[in-house]
């Protein structure tokens, strides 16, 4: 740390899921949102005072030059808990609503039946606003007791279960599907299981949320490995699809053959807008950067391109891509390895 650096939040070490997502609010200056994932001991996530599996907001404007750091476990505003690993966090540019994308668990069984192929679903969760209202804040989103349904047909004893409702992995006297549905906060939208959303960014007018899906590792037929959008109502800051929707995602860019994933696929991770309104996307598996820019021309349904073998280092600027990719574009243009491909 440099001479002018200081610790503003402490006490959030984990043995597992060690990354921390930080969001600086543009609607409420001075606020920082911090997402902290779970630990090895699942039971600890059921205790609010543990500070695990939580998203909290802190007002840095309240810190003076002699203030002690905020204690993550006891300070700040609780936006939500029971969140296993909400890596992507974003603020709606119009309403200031805070959203996160949740990576749910793997290897789920129920009543001795393996249901992990299509359950539980990944989640888009809403956490209220950073202004004076506390509506939709502080709720328990279920982990590690309750999870979101994606495919109810795969779940034994599924009466009353629909897409997006909460279900109990193991029902007993203290936790049932009914308790999960009534006492825990369900996601605003649910996505297919194991897609692994790692980032979310809104466009400037708040009409679309772009989500980077890193892709599955625990599924017979790989899913994810894509950049997708969710349509929003800019005025309300709400998704246009209902919470039970199975069609909320529209793929913008995806690998052409998921059967060869993850070894021969790009895997989206981080997203960032630049001053020209272009969306930059990183792929950790291939060390590459994509740049997407909207076009005013009439969109085509799909477009694809074959990338020649790179002649330099895989992560060198301007090198061509080593993988064949397909882009599903809606009025967009794609820059790949320095080459602009109009879609």
Q: Language-model segments: which ranges?
A:
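Beta-propeller domain segments
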Residues: 38-40, 53-73, 84-85, 90-254, ...
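Hydrophobic beta-strand segments that make up the repeating blades of beta-propeller
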Residues: 30-34, 98-100, 209-211, 278-281
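C-terminal low-complexity, Ser/Thr- and acidic/Pro-rich disordered "stalk" regions positioned immediately N-terminal
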Residues: 296-318
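Cleavable C-terminal sorting propeptides in eukaryotic secreted/cell-surface proteins
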Residues: 315-343
């Amino acid at each position: 740390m440099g001479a002018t650096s200081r610790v503003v939040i402490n006490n959030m070490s984990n043995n597992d899921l060690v990354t921390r997502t930080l969001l600086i609010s543009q609607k409420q200056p001075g606020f920082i949102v911090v997402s902290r994932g779970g630990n090895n001991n699942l039971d600890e996530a059921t205790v609010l005072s543990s500070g695990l599996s939580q998203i909290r907001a802190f007002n840095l404007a309240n810190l003076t030059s002699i203030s002690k750091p905020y204690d993550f476990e006891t300070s700040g505003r609780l936006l939500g808990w029971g969140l296993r690993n909400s890596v992507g966090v974003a603020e709606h540019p119009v309403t200031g609503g805070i959203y996160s994308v949740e990576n749910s668990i793997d290897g789920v069984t129920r009543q001795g039946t393996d249901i992990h192929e299509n359950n539980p679903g990944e989640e888009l969760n809403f956490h209220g606003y950073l202004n004076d209202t506390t509506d939709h804040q502080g709720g328990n989103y279920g982990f590690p007791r309750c999870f979101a349904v994606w495919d109810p047909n795969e779940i034994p004893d599924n009466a009353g279960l629909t897409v997006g409702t909460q279900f109990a992995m193991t029902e007993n006297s203290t936790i049932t599907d009914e308790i999960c549905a009534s006492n825990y906060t369900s996601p605003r939208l649910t996505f297919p299981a194991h897609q692994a959303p790692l980032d979310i960014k809104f466009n400037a007018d708040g009409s679309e949320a772009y989500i980077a899906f890193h892709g599955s590792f625990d599924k017979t037929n790989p899913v994810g490995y894509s950049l997708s959008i969710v349509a929003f109502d800019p005025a309300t800051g709400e998704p246009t699809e209902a919470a039970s929707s199975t069609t909320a995602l529209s793929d913008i860019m995806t690998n052409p053959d998921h059967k060869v994933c993850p070894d021969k696929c790009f895997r989206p991770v981080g997203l960032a807008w630049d001053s020209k309104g272009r969306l930059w996307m990183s792929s950790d598996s291939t060390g590459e950067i994509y740049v997407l820019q909207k076009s005013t021309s009439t969109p085509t349904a799909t477009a694809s391109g074959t990338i020649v073998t790179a002649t330099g280092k895989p992560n060198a600027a301007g090198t061509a891509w080593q993988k064949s990719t397909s882009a599903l574009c809606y009025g967009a243009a794609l820059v790949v390895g320095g080459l602009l491909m109009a879609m």
